[in-house]
Each structure stands twice: as structure tokens, then as C-alpha cells.
């Protein structure tokens, strides 16, 4: 298991890529909440539309779909479908001791693809 040490540049590459992806998943959930609060719409649960500190002025329709909120929610779901598999497969990839350049291309390539996917999807690109 010498591959799973910070002296292994392939493992360092993996830890950087994995850290960015975990932060992205965590941040996307909060982005959805911010969009929900700023639009005062797109709430999921009936209790979300009741008066309270997070919803001082309830109004009809807060439980209706809101494209801005729902788009962010779909990005988050897509992250939750793809990033855990990347974390597992990436770690297995480190264990086979691949060439550093190949690891950098594949691992950082995945990170770039996920970030570009988020940008394209959040701005409704096709």
C-alpha cells in the first residue's frame, strides 16, 4: 500500500481531485438553498412554505417548481450520481500505480468535465 501515501504523486493528484469534487457536492447543496431563499420558491416540503425565520412572508406557489431552484437541485443530484463513483474508481486507479501524466489527465480531466457540466447546465447551454 505504498501507493496511498502523500509521497506518491499519483495519490496526491487523486486527493486534490477528490477534495475538489467533495467540496463541489457540498457547495452545490448550499447553492440550491440560496437559490430557494432568494427566489422564495421551489420549496419541497409543505412545512417549508409556512411562516418562520427562513420564510417570513409565505405566499401561495412557494411549493411550485422554480426553474432556477430545480436546475440547481438537478445539478446536485447529478453530482451525487457521478462523484461517489469517481471517488471509488479513482482510488482503485491509484492502487494500480498508473503513470503520473495519465493520472493527471484522467483525474483532473474529470474535475474539469464536472465543473464545465455545472457551468453549462446552470446557464441552460445545450
What are these regions (language model features)?
Residues 1-16, 90-105:
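Helix-coil boundary and interhelical linker segments in multi-pass alpha-helical membrane proteins
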Residues 8-55:
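N-terminal signal-anchor transmembrane alpha helix
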Residues 17-20, 73-76, 106-109:
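Physicochemical signature of membrane-embedded alpha-helices that form the seven-helix bundle of GPCRs
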Residues 28, 33, 96-97, 101, ...:
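Membrane-embedded alpha-helical bundles that constitute the cytochrome b-like, heme-associated redox core
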Residues 52-79:
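Short membrane-interface loop/juxtamembrane segments of multi-pass integral membrane proteins
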Residues 74-77, 122-126:
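Interhelical loop and helix-boundary elements at the membrane-water interface
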Residues 77-92:
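Core segments of transmembrane alpha-helices
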Residues 108-124:
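Transmembrane alpha-helical segments of integral membrane proteins
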Amino acid at each position: 500500500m505504498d501507493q496511498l501515501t502523500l509521497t506518491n504523486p499519483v495519490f496526491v493528484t487523486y486527493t486534490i481531485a477528490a477534495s475538489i469534487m467533495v467540496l463541489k457536492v457540498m457547495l452545490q447543496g448550499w447553492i440550491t438553498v440560496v437559490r430557494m431563499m432568494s427566489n422564495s420558491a421551489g420549496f419541497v416540503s409543505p412545512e417549508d412554505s409556512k411562516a418562520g425565520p427562513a420564510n417570513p412572508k409565505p405566499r401561495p406557489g412557494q411549493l411550485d417548481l422554480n426553474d432556477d431552484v430545480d436546475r440547481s437541485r438537478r445539478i446536485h443530484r447529478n453530482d451525487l450520481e457521478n462523484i461517489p463513483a469517481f471517488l471509488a474508481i479513482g482510488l482503485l486507479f491509484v492502487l494500480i500505480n498508473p503513470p503520473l501524466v495519465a493520472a493527471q489527465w484522467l483525474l483532473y480531466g474529470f474535475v474539469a468535465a464536472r465543473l464545465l457540466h455545472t457551468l453549462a447546465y446552470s446557464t441552460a447551454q445545450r
